[in-house]
Regions:
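Core nucleotide-handling region used for phosphoryl-transfer chemistry
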Residues: 1-274
Length: 274
């Protein structure tokens, strides 16, 4: 991002953060650079953006990898494995990451892209078992069945994002997430006291049902992750549970189980078991 921004400023002699319809300032920078004679001097920038979905709201830009069906011309059966290895795994980090385009800072840094067992070679059951055998710590957590939302305290205010939206005025899920944040005082206090951390939540709502069936009483924002905006370090589930208890907010569960236990129990789960 900074490279493209600096190149635009060098070639054009100014910088602008304006949008044009759905085109973000980043789209326009690359478009403008490629219109300089001789045209299309920056194919690598065009290629980089071709696999991204961008969403801008003022000075904030959300970057997310595109849907497989878009990237691979409708071939949704393609696993997309190539996507996650090119550009040194750049797209793995583009999972609704949000940057301040004016000050060149990471604002929200959610989980990097992760995969199901046997979805890729790196997550084959054999490789996972090998990594567990060499790991210092292994944690098993309940995977809630909602939508990811992330939040942080930035420049004196709460900033939230969903999977594809940074503007609550255009996303009812995100708008609902903000309401949930302000319903419990612990959320805002936690965000204020740890401004350089992205807090990652599972948004559970009866209006946003998936496979698992939840009750009205189970609606809310469940703390499922924390990540440093400065280093990218992810916090352990043990730390997450401590934060949730300290600030009295809902969270996930961790279990004292083996991988074999988990794999066996998966076959016995029904759609109303969270």
């Amino acid at each position: 991002f900074i490279e493209i921004k600096n190149e635009f400023h060098k070639r054009m002699g100014y910088i602008t953060y304006d949008m044009d319809g759905k085109k973000t300032c980043l789209d326009l920078w690359v478009e403008c650079l490629n219109n300089i004679e001789p045209i299309n001097q920056y194919p690598e920038y065009t290629d980089l953006l071709s696999r991204l979905e961008l969403n801008q709201n003022g000075q904030f830009l959300l970057l997310r990898y595109g849907q497989y069906s878009d990237i691979y011309n409708g071939e949704i059966d393609n696993s997309g494995e190539e996507l996650w290895s090119i550009y040194d795994g750049f797209y793995r980090e583009c999972r609704s990451i949000v940057i301040d385009i004016v000050n060149d800072k990471i604002v929200l840094c959610p989980f990097a892209k992760f995969f199901n067992i046997n979805e890729l070679e790196e997550t084959s059951l054999e490789n996972i078992q090998s990594r567990i055998g060499n790991a210092k710590t292994v944690e098993f957590s309940n995977k809630l069945d909602g939508s990811m939302q992330s939040a942080t305290w930035y420049n004196g205010q709460i900033i939230m994002a969903g999977s594809q939206s940074i503007n609550p005025n255009t996303s009812w899920r995100l708008q609902d997430g903000y309401k949930m944040i302000y319903q419990l005082p612990g959320y805002e206090r936690m965000l204020r006291e740890y401004p350089n951390i992205t807090f990652i939540f599972e948004y559970i709502s009866l209006k946003d049902t998936h496979v698992v069936k939840y009750t009205k009483e189970q609606e809310g924002l469940y703390l499922i992750g924390m990540r440093s905006n400065l280093t990218g370090e992810e916090y352990s589930y043990e730390s997450i549970l401590k934060f949730a208890k300290l600030y009295n907010i809902p969270t996930t569960e961790i279990f004292n189980k083996t991988l074999d236990d988990v794999m066996t129990e998966l076959d016995d789960k029904s759609s109303d078991e969270a």
